[in-house]
Amino acid sequence: MTDKLSHEYTPGLHGHITHTELASIDPEATREWCAAVFPWTFQPPFQGPQGDYHLFAYSGQGGGGIRRTADGESPGSTPTVHVDDADVTYRAALLAGAESLAEPHDVMPGVRVAVVRAPGGVVIALSGPTA
């Protein structure tokens, strides 16, 4: 968890995809390419578990991040769905047949995240406010 960033919960977005995480073998090159092609605004990178994490915004209610792939991970993207309560939605997802990839945990002040694999193999992150 980082102390540098925080996030205030935005009510009314339950069920909306509000963040997309891009896993890249070369995050800096991906960032440069995205900045050249899309009208995204980037914040200065901060240190994450896989190295520099590059946050971007593309609207007042959406954005994402670019990070280095983990060992053995293929490049790709993970949509993050905004939820009212990450713990409650995580449990509901498991009861509905999802597989747990990461239990709910705080990633920064104000943000709690869990990750599941939905039936059919799709990976989806759930993001809600901290308690």
What kind of region is each of these model predictions?
Residues 1-31, 77-79, 127-131:
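N-terminal beta-strand motif that seeds the catalytic metal site of vicinal oxygen chelate
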Residues 17-25, 70-94, 112-117:
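Vicinal oxygen chelate
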Residues 41-48, 102-107, 131:
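Conserved catalytic-core motifs of GNAT/GCN5-like acyltransferases
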Residues 56-60, 116-119, 129:
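Active-site beta-strand termini and strand-to-loop segments that position acidic
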